[in-house]
Amino acid sequence: MSIASFRCHALSVVTALTVQDSAGIENTTVVDSDWLEDQARTILEDMPVRCFKIGTLGSIENVAVAAEIIADYPDIPLVLDPVLTSGHSDEFGDEEMVSAIYELLLPQTTLIAVNSREAHRLSAPPDEDEPDSILPFDECARRLLETGCEYALLTGVHESTATTANELYTIRGRVRRDEWDRLPGSFYGSGDTLSASIAACIARGLEVEEAVRQAQEYTWQTLAAAFRPGMGRCIPNRFFWTQLAPGNK
């Protein structure tokens, strides 16, 4: 829905089947890596693609297959949202999968979008001398960008602050910082909305920094207009803009 809001067409490849509701994920079945590859290559042989967006992969095998496919299309930008930590602080993927993402996917990534907890998991391996230390944003970003990744967007959604500060880094350092009023409530899918929106903006030809700006604005609006259809968290209203059209009430 986020991608459609930017007038792009999403071509989905299923990586995992989940049992979930508005509160969270209860169980996951990972798709076999051969199936993942067949899905992706069938689509890529049929239609032109302007941007890749990778979310949950679920297994080391799927990480490896995704990396192989991406390597065959070096001119297509890649937005990586690895989904290593949920909104309820649940951790997904063991350290071997985290290492596989770091070693195989990050070097091919145009932009990685992660919250502070995910950034720390990816940039601070558990075998370091101080595994419980919390790295600052700039150090997390530096370690992520050392792999060859071009941009790192670190979001402050999990920080205990009055505003949410998102920071975009390149190997030169921080290139933009955006602060957003922290909205009341708990949201399900805010990170997915942001990364999908960035991918859509890049697909439409925007430079990365402008894509990040527009995607943040869109995501904040979806959260401001969020609704709560069940007993769990609020769902971003990705089509909020239709309610702002003249004549709509």
Q: Where are these predicted regions, by residue range?
A:
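Conserved N-terminal subdomain of the carbohydrate kinase-like
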Residues: 1-87, 241-247
